[in-house]
Amino acid sequence: MKAFWRNAALLAVSLLPFSSANALALQAKQYGDFDRYVLALSWQTGFCQSQHDRNRNERDECRLQTETTNKADFLTVHGLWPGLPKSVAARGVDERRWMRFGCATRPIPNLPEARASRMCSSPETGLSLETAAKLSEVMPGAGGRSCLERYEYAKHGACFGFDPDAYFGTMVRLNQEIKESEAGKFLADNYGKTVSRRDFDAAFAKSWGKENVKAVKLTCQGNPAYLTEIQISIKADAINAPLSANSFLPQPHPGNCGKTFVIDKAGY
């Protein structure tokens, strides 16, 4: 099923002229009074290792994972999460509840809850085949039996009325910018090695300035710790522009990776 979904999308791209689907402006049609997005990127080998270590059912994207020539390609898209809108906060909703329930938060937006245990039960996103093909290259859990893109849109996109192509196209673009940055090169160059948080921060600072290191939250699992996710806080009013030193906002916590961690490689 996964292969069919991807192959159909790739065929569609070959039959269509190139368009700027992934360059459509991302604009909230409602609840647009928030100040930031969190770009969540998985270190895919670490994510799969964490699922294995916790005896979770192996996802197709982990079972089929293979080595790649460009190790930066293991930096994949998890999601793009709008911050808490002021209009929702005014109804008594705090950050913790917003991040847990997203668009299903009560009393508003109060959409049907998207559950991680039943991601394929979430509605189809309405993505164009062209954008779906591009997304499948950077979000291994999209389509197939994982349906990550359905879950992410239902939880973090639907209540804002985001155009699905703009929403996921923005993720594709930002993922590419991070992979091509000094931080992306650092991850690729240190594949399978133990690194320091200080050196990672220095790589990020080379691209976007020392003051923006606080925009990054790193998540690790295991002992010794290995990287599973990178979350980057981006100003809402900068989301449609290429990343620059003026794009970021600080996060309240740097994450749990500690002073050193492993850039995990493929395999268990």
UniProtKB/Swiss-Prot annotation:
Signal sequence bounds:
1-23
Disulfide cysteine pairs (residue numbers)? 103-159
EC numbers for this chain: 4.6.1.21
**What is an example of a GO molecular function annotated in this UniProt entry?**
ribonuclease T2 activity
UniProt entry tagged with the keyword Signal: yes
* Sorted UniProt keywords: Cytoplasm, Disulfide bond, Endonuclease, Hydrolase, Lyase, Nuclease, Periplasm, Signal
Q: Which GO terms describe its cellular component?
A: cytoplasm; outer membrane-bounded periplasmic space
Q: How is it modified after translation?
A: Contains four disulfide bonds.
Q: Which domain of life is it from?
A: Bacteria
Q: Pfam families attached here?
A: Ribonuclease_T2
The residues responsible for catalysis, as annotated, are 78, 152, 156
Biological process GO annotation list?
RNA catabolic process
Q: Which InterPro entries match?
A: RNase_T2-like (IPR001568), RNase_T2-like_sf (IPR036430), RNase_T2_His_AS_1 (IPR018188), RNase_T2_His_AS_2 (IPR033130), RNase_T2_prok (IPR039378)
Entry similarity comment? Belongs to the RNase T2 family.
The UniProt function text for this chain reads: One of the few RNases that cleaves the phosphodiester bond between any two nucleotide. Shows a preference for cytidylic or guanylic acid.
The protein's name in its UniProt record: Ribonuclease I
Its organism's taxonomic lineage begins at: Bacteria, Pseudomonadati, Pseudomonadota, Gammaproteobacteria, Enterobacterales
